[in-house]
Structure formats: C-alpha cells, structure tokens
C-alpha cells in the first residue's frame, strides 16, 4: 500500500467514527476554516500573484471573498439544510410515515484546476464539510505556490485524517482517481474530465464534472454597445482570459460590429492603459505550455488582429487581442481558447446566431446583450447552456442562490450555496410503519382482494 492509498483508508476510517455527522462538528470546522483563510490572506494573495499575476483586488474578489461568503452562508443555513424531511405518504401505505434523511456520501475527492486555484478548492470543500464528508484535495500542480499555501492552511486547521491535501502531478492524480472514493468532484478540461469519469466508473463512483467549452456572447443590433464592451472586456480579460465561463467568442449583428470593435478597443485602454504589459491589473498566463498554445493560435490569426497581438515569453504575457473577420473553420474556433484572445464573428439574423450555437457542443455559459425582450426570451428558451447572463458576463457565478454547472460536454452536476451541500449529500429515504394496524390487503392469500387493491390505487 502506497502513501496515497494509506491516506485514503485513513480518511475512510475517520468518517466511520461518525464524528462528521454531528451538525455542531461541521459548523465548528467551517468556523475554523474561515478563521484560517483570514489569517492566511496575505500568503494567499502573494501566491496568486506569483503564480498568475493576479492583482490583489481581483484575487480577493474572485478567490478569497467569495469563499468566505460561502462559508458564512453554509454555517447560517446548515441546520435547515440538514433537516430530515417528512413527506406525504399515499393512503395505500397506511399506517406509515415517510422520511428523507440527508446523509454524507463518505470520503470524497476534490480535484482543482489552475485558473482559480484557491477558490475552486474551497468552494466544493465547503459543501463537502457542510454535508458531513471527509475529503482529500488535489490542488493544481501548475500553481505550486498556491498549492503549498493550501497545504499549510489545511494541515494547521484540520486533522489530517479528516481533510488531507495531496500535492503532485499526473501520477498522483492517476492514483487518486482509481481509488474507491464515495464521490469525486472534478474541475478542469473536458479531456481530463473524460479520464476522471472513466476511472470513477470502474468503482461506480458518482461524479461532478465542471469543465468548459466555447461560451458565446451574442450582441444584437439593439444592445447598449458601451455597456456591452465594458462587461465583455471584464468577463473575457479578467485573469488573462483563464476563466472557464469567460466569453470565448462574440457573435455580433453585422450592423453594429464596427461600433463594438471600436468600443472594445477603447475599453481595453481605459481598463489597462496604453502599455497593458505594465498594468498592475492585468494577469499572466499560468505556464509556458499554455503560453505557447495561445501564441500558436495568435500566429494562425495574424491577418485578423484588430487590437493587441503582442506577447512576451519571459513574462508569460499575452496582450488582450481582438480578432475580426473570423470564420467558423478558423483555427481559433476549433478549441476552447482559455486565454486573452477574442474572436468576433458576425450574423445577419437571430435565427442564424441560434443555429450557429446549436451546431456546437452545449456551452458552460452564454451571454446576450440586447434590449429586445423577444430576442432575450428566444435565446433563453431555445439554447441549452449551463448558466449565463443577459447584459452581463460572469456575474451569475456571484449569486450563491443560483446553481452553477455545465450541461453536455461542458459538464455534469452543480454546486454553489445549498447546491454544494446537495451535491455532497445522499438523500436516504425510509418509512416508519406502525405495528398496531395491518390491513392485510397486500398479503397472500389474494382471493377476494382484487377490488380492494384497485380501490387503494384510485385514492
């Protein structure tokens, strides 16, 4: 038995002590986690800057603040979330009462990505703790400074058999995903998600897969172009485009395309200044592998660049870039970009835009900028996507009352707020039947009972 396997079985043993099923225990662990995050705030911010070049305002808002808010909500609502529910019982089961009990799955695995390497560890972990599970966390090896801070924070806060962090790369992940966890929560690419899903299926382990895809933005002829440009630039270029729900491409009505490009270019200068590379508010690509993947896409689209296009390998810097005259068969349209390059395509009618999106895998997010209520309702009703926004980008993630998750190739399962608790909770059903009464209608011998059985099922 290797070290990882031993940690897994130690975690299973801790769960079997029944400690985590105590509601007061769970609330106390969430309280400890909140306190630890606050005490590690400066270390977390420094690590996020070192690994991804994140400005501390952006880092706090998207990584720390949102996590602390989730903990606060979970602690406040946990008593209600965990209540056993008494549900209606049909007359033919009289005298019986029916219940749904919320119970933890057991020992869960959380695999996190590099783009929001702190928040995407702790958001699912909050749900796992609130639901009463033990957990093993695998942070991304591509953000090693954040991973080290997470490990220190967890080790100083929790019993290692309760919450454990496994650092490492592909080898460690392969070992973990083949173990018989009670639940696996994965955030990352579609290709790796398929590997995780296949491995989990060997042990019939339920999974949540939070992946990505090419999330479109539709800008119609009625849109407020200034507002659209600001909100699209925020959604696309936050974290240097390394956001799973970032706008991947724009579908703009041909009549307002030039105005939109002008507005986007102006907004980028307003956000980051004339020398964007020197801006303290603009991030960096996580590593050279992803940098070279993105510069390869840029090189294939040199004739399409209408803004940006510059890069610096030493800094892993890629300038925010706008591409015009892009077609569906362009290289940039064949994969999720996951970087600061924004292709702009045109359409003539909403039917054409909807058909274009229908022809592609279901996106994790979709955004529409429009003042036309009919167009808005058509997009909402006719297109399938994980989540999205009308006249904004990204911000649907900020509401903990909304479930977040993909559909089709962009993922399965959902979380955030109570949905995180539900994800890591098994709803166990049972009935309680009195021993004082028994109709006997359902028991052999059945002679003469047919009409009574039919009568029961009519009620």
Curated annotation (Swiss-Prot):
Deletion phenotype: Cells lacking this gene are unable to produce staphyloxanthin and cause accumulation of 4,4'- diaponeurosporen-4-al.
Assigned EC number: 1.2.1.-
Annotated catalysed reactions: 4,4'-diaponeurosporenal + NAD(+) + H2O = 4,4'-diaponeurosporenoate + NADH + 2 H(+)
Pfam families: Aldedh (PF00171)
List of catalytic residues: 210, 244
CDD domains assigned: ALDH_YwdH-P39616 (cd07136)
GO CC term (a single one): cytoplasm
Keyword Signal assigned: no
InterPro entries membership: Ald_DH/histidinol_DH, Ald_DH_C, Ald_DH_CS_CYS, Ald_DH_CS_GLU, Ald_DH_N, Aldehyde_DH_dom, Aldehyde_DH_NAD(P)
Function description: Involved in the biosynthesis of the yellow-orange carotenoid staphyloxanthin, which plays a role in the virulence via its protective function against oxidative stress. Catalyzes the oxidation of 4,4'-diaponeurosporen-4-al to yield 4,4'-diaponeurosporenoic acid.
Family per similarity comment: Belongs to the aldehyde dehydrogenase family.
Entry protein name: 4,4'-diaponeurosporen-aldehyde dehydrogenase
Annotated gene: aldH1
């Amino acid at each position: 038995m290797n070290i990882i396997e031993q940690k897994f079985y130690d975690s299973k043993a801790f769960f079997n002590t029944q400690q985590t099923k105590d509601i007061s225990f769970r609330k106390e662990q969430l309280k400890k986690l909140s306190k630890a995050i606050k005490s590690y705030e400066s270390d977390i911010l420094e690590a996020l800057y070192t690994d991804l070049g994140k400005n501390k305002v952006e880092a706090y808002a998207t990584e720390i603040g949102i996590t602390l808010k989730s903990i606060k909500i979970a602690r406040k609502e946990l008593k209600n979330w965990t209540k056993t529910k008494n549900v209606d019982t049909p007359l033919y089961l009289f005298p019986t009462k029916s219940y749904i009990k919320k119970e933890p799955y057991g020992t869960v695995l959380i695999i996190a990505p590099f783009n929001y390497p702190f928040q995407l560890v702790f958001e699912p972990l909050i749900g796992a703790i609130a639901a009463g599970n033990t957990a093993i966390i695998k942070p991304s090896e591509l953000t090693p400074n954040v991973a080290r801070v997470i490990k220190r924070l967890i080790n100083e806060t929790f019993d290692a058999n309760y919450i454990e962090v496994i650092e490492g790369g592909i080898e460690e992940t392969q070992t973990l995903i083949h173990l018989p966890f009670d639940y696996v929560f994965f955030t990352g690419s579609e290709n790796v998600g398929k590997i995780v899903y296949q491995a989990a299926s060997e042990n019939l382990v339920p999974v949540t897969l939070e992946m990505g895809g090419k999330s479109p933005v539709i800008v119609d002829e009625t849109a407020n172009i200034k507002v659209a440009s600001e909100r699209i630039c925020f959604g696309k270029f936050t974290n240097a485009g390394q956001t799973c729900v970032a706008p991947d491409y724009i579908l703009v009505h041909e009549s307002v395309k030039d105005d939109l490009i002008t507005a986007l270019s102006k907004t980028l200068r307003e956000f980051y200044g004339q020398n964007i590379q020197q801006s303290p508010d603009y991030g960096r690509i996580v590593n050279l592998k992803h940098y070279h993947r993105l510069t390869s896409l840029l090189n294939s689209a040199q004739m399409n660049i209408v803004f940006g296009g510059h890069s610096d390998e030493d800094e892993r810097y890629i300038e925010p870039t706008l591409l015009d005259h892009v077609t569906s068969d362009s290289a940039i349209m064949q994969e999720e970009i996951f970087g600061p390059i924004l292709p702009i395509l045109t359409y003539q009618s909403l039917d054409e835009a909807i058909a274009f999106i229908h022809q592609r895998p279901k996106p994790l997010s979709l955004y529409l900028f429009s003042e036309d209520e009919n167009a808005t309702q058509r997009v909402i009703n006719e297109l399938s996507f994980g989540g999205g926004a009308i006249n904004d980008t990204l911000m649907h993630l900020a509401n903990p009352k909304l479930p977040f998750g993909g559909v089709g190739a962009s993922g399965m399962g959902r979380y955030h707020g109570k949905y995180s608790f539900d994800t890591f909770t098994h709803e166990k059903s049972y009935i309680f039947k009195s021993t004082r009464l028994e109709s006997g209608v359902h028991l052999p011998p059945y002679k003469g009972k047919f009409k009574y059985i039919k009568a029961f099922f009519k009620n």
